């Protein structure tokens, strides 16, 4: 999470005034090859030296999140290992990776680094310690073949209803999983309403 003195001025869409692209999700990954390399680099080293950065600037949609003229942004990178190789630990490398992500954004928006007022970085270790997300997994379980569709979160419980009457699952651990904003909640709410008939 980054506090900014101004909006990013992207080289491909110049301008520091709020524009449509500032209000959308932004993925900084110039090619499929870049994305593939980021994945393999992270598997070998724990994080990619050329990371894929997903960026949101929620203050463009809700001006109560930052003082007038300032903004907040969220930078997210999926390709980081929960456990670092070679005995390295996340608390010692958290800021290094955060600065790498800021530098990555700066390649696409040259005013970005200078506009950073402050930041708070969360590594996979921090996500587990603070929020209980095992291994820093924001999807509450791998999006693997054995945990998709009717098998999410596990086979037999893909209908959002849990074994306890009146208990429904509606987060990233439910179908279709994390990254599909709002759908697990929408689908669970539909099941709740069905149960009221």
Per-region residue spans from a language model:
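Flexible loop/turn segments at secondary-structure boundaries
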Residues: 8-11, 61-64, 81-84, 124-126, ...
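Mid-domain catalytic core of redox enzymes
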Residues: 1-66
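C-terminal structured subdomain/cap of oxidoreductase catalytic cores
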Residues: 3-9, 70-72, 89-101, 139-197
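A generic secondary-structure boundary signal that marks alpha-helix termini
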Residues: 84, 110, 194-197
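A glycine-rich dinucleotide-binding beta-alpha-beta segment and adjacent secondary-structure elements
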Residues: 48-56, 107-175
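Flavin-binding catalytic cores
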Residues: 7-8, 27, 34-36, 40-50, ...
């Amino acid at each position: 999470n980054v506090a900014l003195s101004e909006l990013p001025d992207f080289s491909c869409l110049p301008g520091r005034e709020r524009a449509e692209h500032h209000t959308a999700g932004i993925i900084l990954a110039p090619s499929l090859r870049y994305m593939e390399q980021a994945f393999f680099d992270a598997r070998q080293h724990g994080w990619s030296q050329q990371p894929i950065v997903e960026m949101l600037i929620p203050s463009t949609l809700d001006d109560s999140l930052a003082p007038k003229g300032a903004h907040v942004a969220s930078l997210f990178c999926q390709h980081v290992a929960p456990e670092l190789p070679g005995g390295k630990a996340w608390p010692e490398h958290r800021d290094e990776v955060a600065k790498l992500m800021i530098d990555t954004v700066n390649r696409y928006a040259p005013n970005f680094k200078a506009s950073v007022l402050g930041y708070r970085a969360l590594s996979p270790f921090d996500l587990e310690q603070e929020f209980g997300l095992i291994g820093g997994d924001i999807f509450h379980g791998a999006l693997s073949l054995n945990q998709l569709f009717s098998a999410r979160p596990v086979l037999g419980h893909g209908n959002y209803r849990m074994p306890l009457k009146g208990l429904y699952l509606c987060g990233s651990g439910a179908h279709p999983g994390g990254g599909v904003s709002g759908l697990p909640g929408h689908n669970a709410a539909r099941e709740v309403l069905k149960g009221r008939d």
